[in-house]
Amino acid sequence: VSIGIKCDPSIDLCEGQCRIRYFTGYCSGDTCHCS
């Protein structure tokens, strides 16, 4: 699920936001996805 967060400059925001509502975060290109 893409939540509209960029992975640049840091993946930490992506992972942190994904953990709130999902399980984990990963990057595809510069876009954060939660799964």
Swiss-Prot record:
GO cellular component terms given for this protein: extracellular region
Tissue: Expressed by the venom gland.
UniProt-annotated location(s): Secreted
Chief location of this protein within or outside the cell: secreted
Disulfide links within the chain: C7-C27, C14-C32, C18-C34
Key words, A-Z: Disulfide bond, Neurotoxin, Secreted, Toxin
Signal sequence interval, chain numbering: none
GO molecular function: toxin activity
Protein task: Neurotoxin. Decreases the action potential of myelinated nerves in mice and frogs.
Protein name: Neurotoxin
Organism of origin: Buthus sp. (strain IY-2001)
Organism placement in taxonomy: Eukaryota, Metazoa, Ecdysozoa, Arthropoda, Chelicerata
